[in-house]
């Protein structure tokens, strides 16, 4: 009886603490939202009480503005997706106000830059290389040139700073949060670019890539505003990409060339199309789909074709099957009606019985995508639930193949719905109950029911390629858990074990 009473009191103690904890969490979230919207969306609150009707309606309006910019469901409330965006590391330049449009650029093409100080996180040579490559990202698509100087005033003054710094009207907030900021072309602070020294700067993707953040900030220093295109380098939130890959989207290129124009055109000898090799260790795919008892892997103008029960691999031109389809497809999947849908940009084609159906291509927006979605990165249909997942940037949509409508509650962030696979997906398909997600030269075998990765492999393991010694990627993926939210699960498990231990100890005490 005593042990039961103690257990009851313990339960009441934990239960009574929850409302207070929830209230405190709500207050912290509201303070976070106010600071975020004030910094990036020009929110001006009168007084300190957000519950006032005037301030409340103003806050709701700014939340809606922010949700619309990031492509979230516009509710005006601080839902979990909105808070998650607000907590994501990002650029310190506002999303609205004077930065709402592309700004006038420099009135010259030959610009100078100077690195005022260096971060101790990286070797000086690595910092120099990251800055140089970040500037080259923009010079490769414009007539701009960049020359490094070692003294005097440069057009772009580069510095690593912390918190409140010098004459700069912007400040840093310590680790995470704001990573950097830059000022548009002009006199004084114009072109100046600052990075938060409290961050962990790296030359790869282990911490925050200086190359990627610098390339983004230099976009501002050249006159670009933020983009709501989630694939764009000028998207305000930090997205980890392979630094060896070219980071500009067409949206970035169009923006910078609208200010400075494109590269001068010079006649060049045309090069033949590159033919992909199945056993290339860095092989990536544009799209993958089941097609009855086959799987097709698309790359450029070509496709590989394998059968579920045959080890042979066929390599063909896409045009040899479907002359009307374009090259460089971006997504594909087989629906429950044995139709294949293939996607490129804002269009999709439907294939039945190996023939492209008439009246195609059609717009992806008839499937229920909002107008800001310009392309699909990957798609896969769960044949058990008849639900299709579409991957767009860092988000996934779910489509009901029976009602032919998008499911409510979507889009959701990929890292929350499919923990462990990372931020983006290049291609996907289903095989023997597992999803296979492809990102770069890796593929993730994913248990749908357990919501966990079972294996990580190279992309071309389907092609019977001989693995070089020590090349297996089938390992314990602790780093992938950083994306998965499994830390939260482990926390709850630990809390449960702690409570169980306390109760067990109290029972032993009462028995004496």
Swiss-Prot record:
Region (Required for retention in the endoplasmic reticulum), start-end ranges: 466-512
Localization, UniProt: Endoplasmic reticulum
Keywords: Calcium, Collagen degradation, Disulfide bond, Endoplasmic reticulum, Glycoprotein, Hydrolase, Metal-binding, Metalloprotease, Protease, Repeat, Signal, Zinc, Zymogen
Residues involved in Ca(2+) 2 binding: 155, 188, 192
Binding site for Ca(2+) 3: 173-174, 178, 196, 199
Transmembrane residue ranges: none
Residues that coordinate or bind Ca(2+) 1: 121, 199
Propeptide part(s) removed at maturation, as residue ranges: 18-98
Signal peptide start-end: 1-17
GO molecular function annotation: metalloendopeptidase activity; zinc ion binding
GO process annotations (BP): collagen catabolic process; extracellular matrix organization; proteolysis
Amino-acid positions noted as binding Ca(2+) 4 in the UniProt annotation, renumbered to this chain: 286, 377, 426
Record's comment on post-translational modification: N-glycosylated.
Motif Cysteine switch, residue range(s) on this chain: 89-96
Active site (catalytic residues): 217
Entries under PANTHER family matching the protein: MATRIX METALLOPROTEINASE, MATRIX METALLOPROTEINASE-27
The name this protein goes by in its record: Matrix metalloproteinase-27
Organism: Tupaia belangeri (Common tree shrew)
Higher taxonomy: Eukaryota, Metazoa, Chordata, Craniata, Vertebrata
């Amino acid at each position: 009886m005593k042990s039961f009473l103690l257990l009851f009191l313990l339960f009441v103690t934990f239960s009574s603490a929850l409302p207070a904890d929830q209230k405190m969490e709500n207050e912290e979230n509201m303070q976070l939202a106010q600071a975020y919207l004030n910094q990036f969306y020009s929110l001006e609150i009168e007084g300190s009480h957000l519950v006032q009707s005037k301030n409340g309606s103003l806050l709701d309006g700014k939340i809606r503005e922010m949700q619309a910019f990031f492509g979230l469901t516009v509710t005006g409330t601080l839902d979990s997706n909105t808070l998650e965006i607000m907590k994501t590391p990002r650029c310190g330049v506002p999303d609205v106000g004077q930065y709402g449009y592309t700004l006038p650029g420099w009135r010259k093409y030959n610009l100078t830059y100077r690195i005022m100080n260096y971060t101790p996180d990286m070797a000086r040579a690595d910092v120099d290389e990251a800055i140089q490559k970040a500037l080259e990202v923009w010079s490769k698509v414009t007539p701009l040139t960049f020359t490094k100087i070692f003294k005097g005033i440069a057009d772009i003054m580069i510095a690593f700073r912390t918190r409140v710094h010098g004459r700069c009207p912007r400040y840093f907030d310590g680790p995470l949060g704001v990573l950097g900021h830059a000022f548009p072309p002009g006199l004084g602070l114009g072109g100046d670019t600052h990075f938060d020294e409290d961050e962990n700067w790296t030359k790869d993707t282990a911490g925050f890539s200086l190359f990627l953040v610098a390339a983004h900030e230099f976009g501002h220093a050249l006159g670009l505003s933020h983009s709501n295109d989630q694939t764009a380098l000028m998207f305000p939130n930090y997205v980890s990409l392979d630094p060896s890959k070219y980071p500009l989207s067409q949206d970035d290129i169009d923006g910078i060339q609208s200010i400075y124009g494109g590269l001068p055109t010079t006649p060049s000898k045309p090069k033949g199309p590159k033919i992909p090799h199945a056993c290339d260790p860095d092989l990536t795919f544009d799209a993958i789909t089941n097609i009855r008892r086959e799987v097709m892997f698309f790359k450029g103008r070509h496709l590989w074709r394998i059968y579920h029960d045959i080890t042979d691999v066929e390599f063909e031109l896409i045009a040899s099957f479907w002359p009307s389809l374009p090259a460089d497809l971006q997504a594909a999947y087989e629906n429950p009606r044995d139709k294949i849908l293939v996607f490129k940009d804002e269009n999709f084609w439907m294939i039945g019985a190996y023939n492209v159906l008439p009246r195609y291509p059609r717009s992806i927006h008839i499937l229920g995508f909002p107008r800001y979605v310009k392309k699909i990165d990957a798609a896969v249909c769960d044949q058990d639930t008849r639900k299709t997942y579409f991957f767009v940037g860092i988000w996934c949509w779910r489509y009901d193949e029976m009602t032919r409508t998008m499911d409510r509650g979507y889009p959701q962030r990929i890292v929350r719905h499919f923990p462990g696979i990372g931020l983006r997906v290049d291609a996907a398909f289903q095989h023997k109950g597992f999803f296979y997600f492809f990102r770069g030269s890796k593929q993730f075998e994913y248990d749908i029911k357990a919501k966990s990765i079972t294996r990580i492999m190279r992309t071309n393991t389907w092609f019977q390629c001989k693995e070089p010694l020590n090349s297996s990627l089938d390992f314990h993926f602790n780093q992938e858990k950083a994306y998965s939210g499994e830390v939260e699960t482990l926390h709850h498990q630990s809390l449960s074990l702690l409570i169980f231990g306390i109760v067990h100890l109290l029972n032993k005490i009462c028995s004496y």
